[in-house]
Amino acid sequence: MRENKMKIRKLDQSEHGKTRSLWEQVFSEDSQEFVDYYYYIKTKDNTIYVIEEDDEIRAMLQLNPYQVKLQESVVPSDYIVGVATQAEYRGRGYMRNLLIHALQDQYSQKMPFTFLMPAAEAIYYPYDFRFVYEQKQIELDEAFFSARKEYKNDEYRNISQERIVDRDARFMDAGKMAAFVEENFSDCWNVVVLRNAQ
């Protein structure tokens, strides 16, 4: 009888697309448009570690490269994303093995630090990850937009109200959004991820 062996390896860039089906299984809430964008743009220059068993990818961890501004210095860093294991292979320590392997590689490359946005903070606490910020999210309801539209139709409308444009961001807007954040907010923080058009 053949023994099933778990194998950890870093994929060649040409193999990155092999992880897409696992992404779609585990992160089923992601839209088709987002997954298309991610696998067309982000996987061009990222690093993907996988665990294979029976010659199939069973788990993955992706590292997306970013430049991070630490006060006045700019340093390379990786954002851990796409940590996923097929449902029937969970509970075998695959995530732990991938994380340790990736962090050891980063250490040998003298990567100053890495970051992530965990589904649950407790998952990564044993690996010395610590909470550094809380992401604020604001939802504007239909009443906000309706009131603004009624007000815009008024002859005495406020000029500042006219500056608000509500539409979905497009891929071509990414560069402008990154420049806006850099120009208006980067001086407010000691640590900030430098954004670009991608």
Predicted regions and their residues:
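Amide-forming acyltransferase catalytic core, primarily the GNAT-like/NAT-type
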Residues: 131, 135-198
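Conserved active-site alpha-helix within GNAT-family acetyltransferase domains
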Residues: 108-112, 118-136
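A conserved beta-strand-loop-helix scaffold within acyl/acetyltransferase catalytic domains
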Residues: 8-83, 179-198
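Short beta->alpha linker loops
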Residues: 14, 118-119, 172
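Conserved acetyl-CoA pyrophosphate-binding loop and the N-cap/start of the following alpha-helix
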Residues: 89-101
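Short coil/turn motifs at secondary-structure junctions
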Residues: 66-68, 88, 121
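Short, Lys/Arg-enriched N-terminal segments with co-localized hydrophobic residues
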Residues: 1-5
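A short, internal acetyl-CoA/4′-phosphopantetheine-binding micro-motif in the GNAT/acyltransferase core
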Residues: 80-90, 119
